[in-house]
Amino acid sequence: MDGHTCDVFVGKLIHTPSLGELEITDATVGVYNGKIVFLEKSMTPKTLEEAKSHHLLKEATIHKLKPLQFMFPGLIDTHIHAPQYPNSGIGIDVPLLQWLEKYTFPLESSLADLEEARQVYKRVVERTLSNGTTFASYFSTLHTPTSALLAEICYSYGQRAYIGKCNMNNLSPDHYCEKSAESSLEATRQLISYMSILDPKREMVTPIITPRFAPSCTEDLLSGCGELAEKHNLPIQTHISENTSEIELVKELFPERKSYADVYDYYKLLTPQTILAHAIHLEDEEIELLTKRSSGISHCPTSNSILASGLANVRKLLDSGINVGLGTDVSGGYAPSILIALRHAAMTSRSLSYVLGDPKVMLDLSELLYLATQGGAEVVSRGDQVGSFAVGKYWDALIVDLSAETHSCVDIFERDTWPVMLSKWVFTSDDRNLAQVWVNGRLVSGFEMKANLKNSTPLTNGVTSSGHQVFKELTQAHLLPRTQCVDTPPSCCGGHCCKEESCRTENCKGAYPANATVTVEEDSGMS
Protein backbone atom coordinates (compact mmCIF):
# COMPACT_ATOMS: atom_id res chain seq x y z
CA MET A 1 0.00 0.00 0.00
CA ASP A 2 3.04 2.26 0.31
CA GLY A 3 4.50 2.16 -3.17
CA HIS A 4 8.27 1.88 -3.47
CA THR A 5 9.32 4.31 -0.76
CA CYS A 6 12.84 4.29 0.64
CA ASP A 7 14.36 5.99 3.68
CA VAL A 8 17.59 5.83 5.65
CA PHE A 9 17.62 6.64 9.37
CA VAL A 10 20.86 7.58 11.13
CA GLY A 11 21.12 7.92 14.90
CA LYS A 12 20.71 6.18 18.24
CA LEU A 13 18.79 2.90 18.18
CA ILE A 14 17.30 1.18 21.24
CA HIS A 15 15.43 -2.13 21.35
CA THR A 16 15.04 -5.42 23.24
CA PRO A 17 15.44 -8.23 20.69
CA SER A 18 15.10 -10.90 23.39
CA LEU A 19 13.89 -11.10 26.98
CA GLY A 20 16.44 -9.46 29.29
CA GLU A 21 18.51 -8.04 26.41
CA LEU A 22 18.59 -4.26 26.08
CA GLU A 23 20.61 -2.90 23.17
CA ILE A 24 21.53 0.80 22.93
CA THR A 25 23.67 1.52 19.89
CA ASP A 26 24.45 3.93 17.08
CA ALA A 27 22.87 2.67 13.88
CA THR A 28 22.13 3.29 10.24
CA VAL A 29 18.88 1.71 9.09
CA GLY A 30 17.70 1.47 5.48
CA VAL A 31 14.00 0.95 4.76
CA TYR A 32 12.55 -0.01 1.37
CA ASN A 33 8.84 -0.41 0.74
CA GLY A 34 8.08 -0.77 4.43
CA LYS A 35 10.79 -3.27 5.36
CA ILE A 36 14.29 -2.98 6.80
CA VAL A 37 16.80 -3.90 4.09
CA PHE A 38 19.97 -2.48 5.67
CA LEU A 39 21.06 -2.26 9.31
CA GLU A 40 24.56 -1.49 10.54
CA LYS A 41 25.42 -0.64 14.14
CA SER A 42 27.33 2.45 13.17
CA MET A 43 26.48 5.95 11.98
CA THR A 44 29.78 6.98 10.44
CA PRO A 45 29.89 8.73 7.04
CA LYS A 46 31.26 5.49 5.59
CA THR A 47 28.27 3.51 6.85
CA LEU A 48 25.88 6.08 5.44
CA GLU A 49 27.57 5.82 2.05
CA GLU A 50 27.24 2.03 2.22
CA ALA A 51 23.53 2.40 2.89
CA LYS A 52 23.06 4.88 0.04
CA SER A 53 24.89 2.54 -2.34
CA HIS A 54 22.49 -0.32 -1.55
CA HIS A 55 20.65 -1.15 -4.76
CA LEU A 56 17.26 -0.47 -3.14
CA LEU A 57 18.27 2.75 -1.39
CA LYS A 58 19.93 4.82 -4.10
CA GLU A 59 17.11 7.40 -4.01
CA ALA A 60 16.48 7.21 -0.27
CA THR A 61 15.46 10.15 1.88
CA ILE A 62 18.05 10.57 4.67
CA HIS A 63 16.77 11.15 8.21
CA LYS A 64 19.54 12.23 10.61
CA LEU A 65 18.30 12.08 14.18
CA LYS A 66 19.03 14.91 16.62
CA PRO A 67 21.30 14.31 19.65
CA LEU A 68 18.38 13.62 22.02
CA GLN A 69 16.36 11.53 19.57
CA PHE A 70 16.37 7.76 19.22
CA MET A 71 14.72 4.98 17.24
CA PHE A 72 12.54 2.54 19.19
CA PRO A 73 10.21 -0.25 18.03
CA GLY A 74 6.52 0.52 17.75
CA LEU A 75 4.48 -0.40 20.83
CA ILE A 76 2.10 -3.36 20.67
CA ASP A 77 -1.24 -3.34 22.50
CA THR A 78 -2.30 -6.97 22.80
CA HIS A 79 -5.71 -6.25 24.33
CA ILE A 80 -7.94 -3.21 23.84
CA HIS A 81 -11.71 -2.71 23.49
CA ALA A 82 -12.20 -0.01 20.84
CA PRO A 83 -15.92 0.63 21.53
CA GLN A 84 -15.26 1.20 25.23
CA TYR A 85 -13.01 4.21 24.61
CA PRO A 86 -15.68 6.80 25.59
CA ASN A 87 -15.78 5.18 29.05
CA SER A 88 -12.07 5.72 29.70
CA GLY A 89 -11.55 7.09 33.18
CA ILE A 90 -14.92 6.11 34.63
CA GLY A 91 -16.42 3.05 36.28
CA ILE A 92 -14.12 2.31 39.20
CA ASP A 93 -17.01 1.79 41.63
CA VAL A 94 -17.84 -1.86 40.84
CA PRO A 95 -15.99 -5.14 40.12
CA LEU A 96 -15.81 -6.83 36.74
CA LEU A 97 -19.16 -8.55 36.22
CA GLN A 98 -21.18 -5.61 37.56
CA TRP A 99 -18.97 -3.24 35.56
CA LEU A 100 -19.96 -5.04 32.37
CA GLU A 101 -23.66 -4.66 33.13
CA LYS A 102 -23.53 -1.06 34.36
CA TYR A 103 -21.07 0.57 31.98
CA THR A 104 -19.84 -1.65 29.17
CA PHE A 105 -22.78 -3.42 27.57
CA PRO A 106 -24.95 -0.26 27.32
CA LEU A 107 -22.14 1.62 25.58
CA GLU A 108 -21.21 -1.19 23.22
CA SER A 109 -24.83 -1.81 22.22
CA SER A 110 -25.19 1.87 21.26
CA LEU A 111 -22.42 1.52 18.70
CA ALA A 112 -24.59 -0.41 16.29
CA ASP A 113 -25.05 3.05 14.80
CA LEU A 114 -22.44 3.62 12.10
CA GLU A 115 -22.03 7.34 12.69
CA GLU A 116 -21.57 6.96 16.44
CA ALA A 117 -19.13 4.11 15.87
CA ARG A 118 -17.19 6.15 13.32
CA GLN A 119 -16.66 9.00 15.77
CA VAL A 120 -15.46 6.63 18.49
CA TYR A 121 -13.24 4.46 16.31
CA LYS A 122 -11.54 7.36 14.54
CA ARG A 123 -10.63 8.86 17.90
CA VAL A 124 -9.37 5.68 19.50
CA VAL A 125 -7.16 4.89 16.49
CA GLU A 126 -5.83 8.45 16.40
CA ARG A 127 -5.16 8.40 20.14
CA THR A 128 -3.43 5.04 20.25
CA LEU A 129 -1.25 5.94 17.27
CA SER A 130 -0.28 9.25 18.88
CA ASN A 131 0.79 7.24 21.94
CA GLY A 132 3.01 5.01 19.82
CA THR A 133 0.80 1.95 19.36
CA THR A 134 1.67 0.60 15.93
CA PHE A 135 -0.15 -2.73 16.39
CA ALA A 136 -3.39 -3.18 18.33
CA SER A 137 -5.50 -6.27 18.94
CA TYR A 138 -9.00 -4.80 19.07
CA PHE A 139 -12.22 -6.18 20.46
CA SER A 140 -15.09 -4.54 18.59
CA THR A 141 -18.79 -5.04 19.37
CA LEU A 142 -21.05 -7.87 18.20
CA HIS A 143 -22.05 -5.76 15.17
CA THR A 144 -20.49 -6.76 11.84
CA PRO A 145 -20.87 -3.45 9.92
CA THR A 146 -19.21 -1.36 12.62
CA SER A 147 -16.49 -3.97 13.07
CA ALA A 148 -15.85 -3.65 9.33
CA LEU A 149 -15.77 0.11 9.79
CA LEU A 150 -13.10 -0.25 12.49
CA ALA A 151 -11.02 -2.31 10.06
CA GLU A 152 -11.40 0.39 7.38
CA ILE A 153 -10.32 3.12 9.80
CA CYS A 154 -7.26 1.20 11.01
CA TYR A 155 -6.30 0.48 7.41
CA SER A 156 -6.76 4.09 6.33
CA TYR A 157 -4.84 5.53 9.28
CA GLY A 158 -2.07 2.99 8.83
CA GLN A 159 -2.27 1.08 12.11
CA ARG A 160 -1.66 -2.65 12.10
CA ALA A 161 -4.57 -4.32 13.82
CA TYR A 162 -6.47 -7.44 14.65
CA ILE A 163 -10.21 -6.77 14.43
CA GLY A 164 -12.50 -9.02 16.44
CA LYS A 165 -16.28 -9.02 16.23
CA CYS A 166 -17.44 -10.28 19.64
CA ASN A 167 -19.19 -13.63 19.70
CA MET A 168 -21.71 -13.65 22.57
CA ASN A 169 -25.05 -15.45 22.67
CA ASN A 170 -25.35 -16.28 26.36
CA LEU A 171 -25.67 -14.52 29.73
CA SER A 172 -25.80 -11.10 28.10
CA PRO A 173 -28.55 -8.46 28.22
CA ASP A 174 -31.44 -8.91 25.78
CA HIS A 175 -30.49 -5.69 24.00
CA TYR A 176 -26.92 -6.89 23.49
CA CYS A 177 -26.96 -10.61 22.80
CA GLU A 178 -26.85 -12.61 19.59
CA LYS A 179 -29.86 -14.81 18.88
CA SER A 180 -28.03 -18.04 18.21
CA ALA A 181 -24.64 -19.61 17.70
CA GLU A 182 -25.22 -19.83 13.95
CA SER A 183 -26.20 -16.18 13.56
CA SER A 184 -23.08 -15.19 15.51
CA LEU A 185 -20.84 -17.39 13.37
CA GLU A 186 -22.45 -16.19 10.12
CA ALA A 187 -21.84 -12.57 11.13
CA THR A 188 -18.22 -13.48 11.81
CA ARG A 189 -17.91 -15.13 8.40
CA GLN A 190 -19.18 -11.93 6.81
CA LEU A 191 -16.48 -9.91 8.55
CA ILE A 192 -13.82 -12.39 7.46
CA SER A 193 -15.02 -12.12 3.86
CA TYR A 194 -15.03 -8.34 3.97
CA MET A 195 -11.55 -8.09 5.46
CA SER A 196 -10.17 -10.56 2.92
CA ILE A 197 -11.08 -7.97 0.28
CA LEU A 198 -9.81 -5.01 2.27
CA ASP A 199 -6.40 -6.59 2.95
CA PRO A 200 -6.02 -9.97 1.21
CA LYS A 201 -2.47 -10.53 2.50
CA ARG A 202 -3.43 -9.64 6.10
CA GLU A 203 -0.43 -7.34 6.17
CA MET A 204 -2.15 -4.47 7.97
CA VAL A 205 -5.55 -5.65 9.24
CA THR A 206 -6.53 -9.21 10.11
CA PRO A 207 -9.77 -10.66 11.47
CA ILE A 208 -9.42 -12.37 14.83
CA ILE A 209 -11.92 -14.86 16.24
CA THR A 210 -13.29 -13.32 19.44
CA PRO A 211 -15.48 -15.36 21.77
CA ARG A 212 -15.90 -12.64 24.40
CA PHE A 213 -15.31 -15.04 27.26
CA ALA A 214 -16.52 -18.54 28.02
CA PRO A 215 -19.66 -17.56 30.02
CA SER A 216 -20.95 -15.38 27.16
CA CYS A 217 -20.92 -18.28 24.69
CA THR A 218 -22.92 -21.48 24.43
CA GLU A 219 -21.00 -24.67 23.79
CA ASP A 220 -21.96 -24.77 20.11
CA LEU A 221 -20.73 -21.19 19.68
CA LEU A 222 -17.39 -21.98 21.33
CA SER A 223 -17.06 -25.03 19.11
CA GLY A 224 -17.93 -23.00 16.01
CA CYS A 225 -15.36 -20.34 16.89
CA GLY A 226 -12.66 -22.98 17.17
CA GLU A 227 -13.64 -24.43 13.80
CA LEU A 228 -13.65 -21.00 12.13
CA ALA A 229 -10.19 -20.19 13.45
CA GLU A 230 -8.86 -23.52 12.24
CA LYS A 231 -10.51 -23.28 8.81
CA HIS A 232 -9.26 -19.77 8.06
CA ASN A 233 -5.95 -19.98 9.99
CA LEU A 234 -6.94 -17.02 12.15
CA PRO A 235 -5.77 -15.78 15.54
CA ILE A 236 -8.09 -16.01 18.56
CA GLN A 237 -8.57 -13.63 21.46
CA THR A 238 -10.60 -13.93 24.64
CA HIS A 239 -10.44 -13.43 28.41
CA ILE A 240 -9.36 -15.87 31.10
CA SER A 241 -9.20 -15.91 34.90
CA GLU A 242 -9.59 -12.18 35.34
CA ASN A 243 -11.82 -12.34 38.39
CA THR A 244 -12.54 -15.02 41.01
CA SER A 245 -16.32 -14.65 40.59
CA GLU A 246 -15.87 -15.16 36.85
CA ILE A 247 -13.93 -18.37 37.49
CA GLU A 248 -16.68 -19.70 39.76
CA LEU A 249 -19.23 -18.93 37.05
CA VAL A 250 -17.20 -20.89 34.51
CA LYS A 251 -17.10 -23.88 36.86
CA GLU A 252 -20.90 -23.74 37.19
CA LEU A 253 -21.47 -23.47 33.44
CA PHE A 254 -18.92 -26.12 32.41
CA PRO A 255 -18.83 -28.64 35.29
CA GLU A 256 -17.41 -31.38 33.07
CA ARG A 257 -14.27 -29.40 32.30
CA LYS A 258 -11.19 -29.49 34.53
CA SER A 259 -10.53 -25.74 34.52
CA TYR A 260 -11.20 -22.43 32.76
CA ALA A 261 -8.30 -23.10 30.39
CA ASP A 262 -9.60 -26.61 29.73
CA VAL A 263 -12.89 -25.13 28.49
CA TYR A 264 -11.05 -23.26 25.76
CA ASP A 265 -8.81 -26.21 24.99
CA TYR A 266 -11.76 -28.57 24.59
CA TYR A 267 -13.22 -26.32 21.89
CA LYS A 268 -9.91 -25.91 20.02
CA LEU A 269 -9.48 -22.32 21.18
CA LEU A 270 -6.00 -22.74 22.67
CA THR A 271 -3.54 -22.45 19.80
CA PRO A 272 -0.17 -20.77 19.19
CA GLN A 273 -2.22 -17.85 17.80
CA THR A 274 -4.41 -17.44 20.90
CA ILE A 275 -4.26 -14.27 23.02
CA LEU A 276 -5.61 -14.71 26.55
CA ALA A 277 -6.22 -11.47 28.43
CA HIS A 278 -5.52 -11.12 32.17
CA ALA A 279 -4.71 -14.69 33.35
CA ILE A 280 -4.42 -13.47 36.94
CA HIS A 281 -5.66 -16.53 38.82
CA LEU A 282 -4.39 -19.44 36.73
CA GLU A 283 -3.82 -22.78 38.42
CA ASP A 284 -0.49 -24.54 37.87
CA GLU A 285 -2.16 -27.13 35.62
CA GLU A 286 -3.56 -24.32 33.48
CA ILE A 287 -0.14 -22.74 33.11
CA GLU A 288 1.23 -26.11 32.00
CA LEU A 289 -1.58 -26.41 29.45
CA LEU A 290 -0.98 -22.92 28.04
CA THR A 291 2.73 -23.67 27.78
CA LYS A 292 1.97 -26.90 25.93
CA ARG A 293 -0.37 -25.10 23.51
CA SER A 294 2.04 -22.14 23.05
CA SER A 295 -0.80 -19.68 23.69
CA GLY A 296 0.10 -16.11 24.68
CA ILE A 297 -1.05 -13.89 27.53
CA SER A 298 -1.91 -10.19 27.52
CA HIS A 299 -0.95 -8.68 30.87
CA CYS A 300 -3.36 -5.83 31.66
CA PRO A 301 -2.10 -4.36 34.95
CA THR A 302 -4.08 -1.12 34.80
CA SER A 303 -7.51 -2.73 34.59
CA ASN A 304 -6.46 -5.54 36.92
CA SER A 305 -5.90 -2.91 39.59
CA ILE A 306 -8.76 -0.52 38.74
CA LEU A 307 -11.34 -3.33 38.81
CA ALA A 308 -9.71 -4.88 41.90
CA SER A 309 -9.25 -8.15 40.04
CA GLY A 310 -5.83 -9.10 41.40
CA LEU A 311 -2.09 -9.10 40.71
CA ALA A 312 -0.82 -11.26 37.86
CA ASN A 313 2.50 -13.01 38.44
CA VAL A 314 4.20 -12.27 35.12
CA ARG A 315 7.51 -13.70 36.30
CA LYS A 316 5.91 -17.09 36.86
CA LEU A 317 4.37 -17.00 33.39
CA LEU A 318 7.65 -16.01 31.73
CA ASP A 319 9.59 -18.65 33.66
CA SER A 320 7.07 -21.21 32.39
CA GLY A 321 7.93 -20.29 28.81
CA ILE A 322 4.69 -18.46 28.03
CA ASN A 323 4.82 -15.42 25.76
CA VAL A 324 3.55 -12.32 27.55
CA GLY A 325 2.72 -8.89 26.15
CA LEU A 326 1.00 -5.80 27.51
CA GLY A 327 -2.58 -4.65 27.03
CA THR A 328 -4.18 -1.34 27.89
CA ASP A 329 -7.58 -3.06 28.20
CA VAL A 330 -9.42 0.17 27.52
CA SER A 331 -11.75 0.97 29.20
CA GLY A 332 -11.19 -1.29 32.18
CA GLY A 333 -7.80 0.33 31.84
CA TYR A 334 -8.23 4.08 31.79
CA ALA A 335 -5.35 5.02 29.45
CA PRO A 336 -4.80 4.12 25.76
CA SER A 337 -1.02 4.14 26.26
CA ILE A 338 1.19 1.07 26.44
CA LEU A 339 3.84 3.09 28.28
CA ILE A 340 1.32 3.67 31.07
CA ALA A 341 0.51 -0.05 31.07
CA LEU A 342 4.25 -0.70 31.30
CA ARG A 343 4.54 1.56 34.35
CA HIS A 344 1.68 -0.26 36.03
CA ALA A 345 3.29 -3.60 35.17
CA ALA A 346 6.39 -2.40 36.99
CA MET A 347 4.36 -1.42 40.05
CA THR A 348 2.37 -4.65 40.00
CA SER A 349 5.53 -6.76 39.94
CA ARG A 350 6.95 -4.80 42.86
CA SER A 351 3.76 -5.03 44.90
CA LEU A 352 3.56 -8.76 44.25
CA SER A 353 7.22 -9.13 45.18
CA TYR A 354 6.41 -7.66 48.59
CA VAL A 355 3.28 -9.79 49.03
CA LEU A 356 5.12 -13.01 48.14
CA GLY A 357 8.38 -12.05 49.82
CA ASP A 358 10.25 -12.83 46.62
CA PRO A 359 12.37 -10.10 44.98
CA LYS A 360 12.78 -12.24 41.85
CA VAL A 361 9.16 -11.47 40.94
CA MET A 362 10.11 -7.87 40.09
CA LEU A 363 10.49 -7.01 36.40
CA ASP A 364 13.42 -4.83 35.37
CA LEU A 365 13.40 -2.11 32.71
CA SER A 366 14.64 -4.29 29.86
CA GLU A 367 12.00 -6.93 30.61
CA LEU A 368 9.24 -4.33 30.75
CA LEU A 369 10.33 -2.86 27.41
CA TYR A 370 10.40 -6.36 25.95
CA LEU A 371 6.79 -6.95 27.03
CA ALA A 372 5.78 -3.70 25.29
CA THR A 373 7.48 -4.60 22.00
CA GLN A 374 9.00 -7.96 21.07
CA GLY A 375 7.04 -9.81 23.76
CA GLY A 376 3.83 -8.34 22.41
CA ALA A 377 4.90 -9.28 18.89
CA GLU A 378 5.32 -12.89 19.99
CA VAL A 379 1.87 -12.86 21.60
CA VAL A 380 0.22 -11.66 18.37
CA SER A 381 2.27 -14.22 16.40
CA ARG A 382 4.24 -11.57 14.52
CA GLY A 383 7.57 -11.92 16.29
CA ASP A 384 9.42 -12.43 13.02
CA GLN A 385 7.87 -9.29 11.51
CA VAL A 386 7.73 -6.56 14.18
CA GLY A 387 8.77 -5.85 17.78
CA SER A 388 12.48 -5.16 17.26
CA PHE A 389 14.86 -4.08 14.52
CA ALA A 390 16.38 -6.56 12.08
CA VAL A 391 16.79 -6.90 8.34
CA GLY A 392 13.58 -8.34 6.93
CA LYS A 393 11.31 -6.89 9.60
CA TYR A 394 8.78 -4.16 8.97
CA TRP A 395 9.73 -0.58 9.79
CA ASP A 396 7.23 -0.12 12.62
CA ALA A 397 9.11 2.43 14.67
CA LEU A 398 9.01 5.46 16.92
CA ILE A 399 11.34 8.43 16.72
CA VAL A 400 11.48 9.56 20.32
CA ASP A 401 12.56 13.14 21.08
CA LEU A 402 13.67 14.10 24.60
CA SER A 403 14.71 17.67 23.83
CA ALA A 404 13.10 20.54 25.75
CA GLU A 405 12.08 22.29 22.54
CA THR A 406 9.32 19.70 22.05
CA HIS A 407 7.55 20.91 25.22
CA SER A 408 8.74 17.67 26.76
CA CYS A 409 7.80 16.80 30.32
CA VAL A 410 11.05 14.80 30.56
CA ASP A 411 13.88 16.77 32.16
CA ILE A 412 17.30 15.80 30.85
CA PHE A 413 20.58 16.86 32.47
CA GLU A 414 24.11 16.86 31.07
CA ARG A 415 25.20 14.02 33.34
CA ASP A 416 22.40 11.71 32.15
CA THR A 417 23.57 8.62 30.26
CA TRP A 418 21.48 6.88 27.62
CA PRO A 419 20.22 4.20 30.06
CA VAL A 420 19.15 7.00 32.41
CA MET A 421 17.45 8.95 29.63
CA LEU A 422 15.68 5.79 28.45
CA SER A 423 14.31 5.16 31.93
CA LYS A 424 13.14 8.77 32.18
CA TRP A 425 11.33 8.43 28.86
CA VAL A 426 9.61 5.25 30.00
CA PHE A 427 8.39 6.64 33.32
CA THR A 428 7.91 10.39 32.78
CA SER A 429 7.11 11.00 29.10
CA ASP A 430 3.90 11.32 27.11
CA ASP A 431 2.91 11.74 23.46
CA ARG A 432 4.74 15.08 23.30
CA ASN A 433 7.95 13.07 23.09
CA LEU A 434 6.97 11.13 19.97
CA ALA A 435 8.24 13.06 16.98
CA GLN A 436 7.34 10.39 14.44
CA VAL A 437 5.36 7.16 14.42
CA TRP A 438 6.08 4.88 11.47
CA VAL A 439 4.11 1.80 10.40
CA ASN A 440 5.05 -0.29 7.39
CA GLY A 441 7.48 2.40 6.29
CA ARG A 442 4.78 5.05 6.35
CA LEU A 443 4.72 8.10 8.64
CA VAL A 444 1.34 7.89 10.40
CA SER A 445 1.56 10.00 13.56
CA GLY A 446 3.79 11.95 15.91
CA PHE A 447 3.95 15.65 16.67
CA GLU A 448 5.65 16.15 13.29
CA MET A 449 2.66 14.65 11.53
CA LYS A 450 -0.70 14.12 13.20
CA ALA A 451 -2.61 11.26 11.60
CA ASN A 452 -5.94 11.92 9.90
CA LEU A 453 -7.84 10.42 7.03
CA LYS A 454 -7.25 13.37 4.69
CA ASN A 455 -3.47 13.00 4.57
CA SER A 456 -3.30 9.24 4.81
CA THR A 457 -2.09 7.27 1.80
CA PRO A 458 -5.12 6.45 -0.38
CA LEU A 459 -6.17 2.84 -0.75
CA THR A 460 -5.78 1.25 -4.15
CA ASN A 461 -8.83 1.66 -6.35
CA GLY A 462 -9.49 -2.07 -6.49
CA VAL A 463 -9.54 -2.50 -2.74
CA THR A 464 -11.53 0.66 -2.19
CA SER A 465 -14.18 -0.25 -4.78
CA SER A 466 -14.64 -3.86 -3.75
CA GLY A 467 -14.28 -3.23 -0.05
CA HIS A 468 -16.71 -0.34 -0.13
CA GLN A 469 -19.29 -2.42 -1.98
CA VAL A 470 -19.06 -5.27 0.52
CA PHE A 471 -19.23 -2.74 3.35
CA LYS A 472 -22.52 -1.51 1.85
CA GLU A 473 -23.79 -5.06 1.73
CA LEU A 474 -23.02 -5.60 5.39
CA THR A 475 -24.69 -2.32 6.22
CA GLN A 476 -27.78 -3.26 4.25
CA ALA A 477 -28.04 -6.72 5.73
CA HIS A 478 -27.74 -5.59 9.31
CA LEU A 479 -29.98 -2.54 9.04
CA LEU A 480 -32.88 -4.68 7.89
CA PRO A 481 -35.28 -4.65 10.85
CA ARG A 482 -35.07 -8.17 12.30
CA THR A 483 -34.58 -9.57 8.79
CA GLN A 484 -31.57 -11.41 7.45
CA CYS A 485 -30.25 -10.56 3.99
CA VAL A 486 -29.03 -13.24 1.62
CA ASP A 487 -25.85 -15.02 2.65
CA THR A 488 -24.03 -14.03 -0.54
CA PRO A 489 -24.42 -11.02 -2.83
CA PRO A 490 -26.87 -11.53 -5.72
CA SER A 491 -25.09 -12.56 -8.91
CA CYS A 492 -27.16 -10.09 -10.93
CA CYS A 493 -25.38 -7.28 -9.11
CA GLY A 494 -21.97 -8.44 -10.28
CA GLY A 495 -21.27 -10.07 -6.93
CA HIS A 496 -22.11 -6.99 -4.90
CA CYS A 497 -25.28 -5.51 -3.45
CA CYS A 498 -26.33 -2.24 -5.00
CA LYS A 499 -28.69 0.53 -3.98
CA GLU A 500 -30.85 0.65 -7.09
CA GLU A 501 -34.46 -0.08 -6.14
CA SER A 502 -35.19 -1.66 -9.53
CA CYS A 503 -32.39 -4.14 -9.00
CA ARG A 504 -33.62 -5.19 -5.60
CA THR A 505 -37.30 -5.46 -6.52
CA GLU A 506 -37.09 -6.87 -10.06
CA ASN A 507 -33.76 -8.48 -10.97
CA CYS A 508 -33.16 -9.75 -7.46
CA LYS A 509 -36.60 -11.17 -6.69
CA GLY A 510 -36.33 -13.28 -3.59
CA ALA A 511 -32.96 -11.88 -2.59
CA TYR A 512 -34.56 -9.48 -0.13
CA PRO A 513 -37.85 -9.87 1.74
CA ALA A 514 -40.63 -8.07 -0.11
CA ASN A 515 -41.44 -5.86 2.88
CA ALA A 516 -37.84 -4.98 3.72
CA THR A 517 -36.58 -1.42 3.73
CA VAL A 518 -32.93 -1.41 2.77
CA THR A 519 -30.96 1.60 3.96
CA VAL A 520 -27.70 2.64 2.32
CA GLU A 521 -25.54 5.51 3.50
CA GLU A 522 -24.71 7.86 0.65
CA ASP A 523 -21.38 8.69 2.25
CA SER A 524 -20.07 5.90 4.41
CA GLY A 525 -16.84 7.69 5.21
CA MET A 526 -14.83 5.27 3.11
CA SER A 527 -12.43 6.74 0.61
From Swiss-Prot:
Q: Which residues bind Zn(2+)?
A: 79, 81, 239, 329
Specify the superkingdom: Eukaryota
Essential cofactor(s): Zn(2+)
Cite the EC number: 3.5.4.3
Relay the cofactor remark from the entry: Binds 1 zinc ion per subunit.
Q: Which UniProt keywords apply?
A: Hydrolase, Metal-binding, Zinc
Q: Which GO terms describe its biological process?
A: guanine catabolic process; guanine metabolic process
Q: Which GO terms describe its molecular function?
A: guanine deaminase activity; zinc ion binding
Pathway listed: Purine metabolism; guanine degradation; xanthine from guanine: step 1/1
Q: Which reaction does it catalyse?
A: guanine + H2O + H(+) = xanthine + NH4(+)
- Residues that, per the record, bind substrate: 81-84, 212-213, 239-242, 329
One GO location term (cellular component): cytosol
Family designation: Belongs to the metallo-dependent hydrolases superfamily. ATZ/TRZ family.
What is the annotated role of this protein in its UniProt record?
Answer: Catalyzes the hydrolytic deamination of guanine, producing xanthine and ammonia.
- Name by which UniProt lists this protein: Probable guanine deaminase
What is the organism field in this record?
Answer: Schizosaccharomyces pombe (strain 972 / ATCC 24843) (Fission yeast)
